[in-house]
Structure formats: C-alpha cells, structure tokens
Regions:
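Active-site acidic carboxylates
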Residues: 1-81, 91, 96, 100
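Short secondary-structure boundary segments
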Residues: 45-46, 106-107, 131
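Active-site nucleophile and cofactor-binding loops and adjacent substrate-binding regions
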Residues: 79-80, 106-109
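Structural motif
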Residues: 84-88
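Short beta-strand-loop elements within alpha/beta enzyme cores
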Residues: 100-106
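Short Gly/Thr/Asp-enriched flexible loops that form oxyanion-binding sites at enzyme active sites
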Residues: 113-123
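Single conserved hydrophobic/aromatic residue that forms the stacking wall/gate
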Residues: 128-139
Length: 140
C-alpha cells in the first residue's frame, strides 16, 4: 500500500480551499497515520513550466509546509493532470516495487485527482480515493 499525496503545493493550499482548516487537519492525520503504519507516502507535484511561478525552483511549487515530505520520501513531478503519465516516473516506480494498492488524496478533485485515479485503474492498480482530504481550489 502507498499513500499518494497529489498537488498539495504552497501555491494552492490556502484559504481558497473549501473547509481549509479541516482539509489541512485531515491530510496531516492521513500522512501521520500512514507513516505510523509503515505505509509509504509518495508525493506528486504539478509543474506549470518555467516562468509561471509554479515550477521547479519556485516557492509556490514546494509542498505545503504542513505536509512536507520527509527526506526519505519520494517525490514525482508531473506536467499534466494524471500522475501516471510516463514522464513522471511514478508508474514505473510502483511497477518496480510490485505495488498495486494506492490511496489517493490531494488537490484539484475534478482534474488531477480524477485523472490520476482513472489512469491508475487503466494501468491495473487498485486505487482508494479518500474523498474527505481532497479539494477543488477556486483558482482565479
């Protein structure tokens, strides 16, 4: 089992999220529990490309401090909605580990979470979408 934490980056984890405090609390608890149970926590970050302010090297790209990965935890970068596009390397990583069970939480339920869950099923993974700690941000 792996806990996949999708797009919980500084640039979109803020008060624009519905029930922000509850979302933060739920994600923290989920990550803490996974770690305590020996479940690997894997992070996926979205990169909009150079010059967008939401790319590798930009502060907004970094994972929200309340959910910060441990130095030993894996991070993958995606440039499209699905975390399982070949470029991210996530699918290959899970395949090498022979890991088929994935819990998913994070941001942009209607886009990145949905695309990741659908693609995961298409690749033969067993996915659990944890609905409470996912949100859709009102980005303007």
């Amino acid at each position: 089992m792996v806990l996949l934490v999708v797009d919980t980056q500084k640039g979109i984890v803020d008060e624009r999220l519905y029930a922000f405090e509850k979302f933060v609390s739920n994600i923290k608890e989920l990550i803490r529990t996974a770690r305590e149970q020996g479940i690997e926590v894997v992070y996926v970050q979205h990169d909009d490309g150079p010059g967008t302010g939401f790319s590798i090297g930009d502060d907004e790209f970094e994972v929200y401090s309340g959910f910060a990965p441990l130095l030993t935890e894996k991070r993958f970068v995606k440039t499209v909605c699905s975390a399982f596009k070949k470029e991210s390397g996530l699918l290959e990583y899970l395949t090498e580990k022979d890991e088929k069970d994935v819990m998913v939480c994070g941001i942009m339920t209607d886009f990145c979470i949905n695309a990741t869950v659908e693609a995961g099923f298409e690749h033969g993974l067993s996915l659990i979408h944890i609905s409470e700690p996912t949100r859709h941000a009102q980005i303007s």
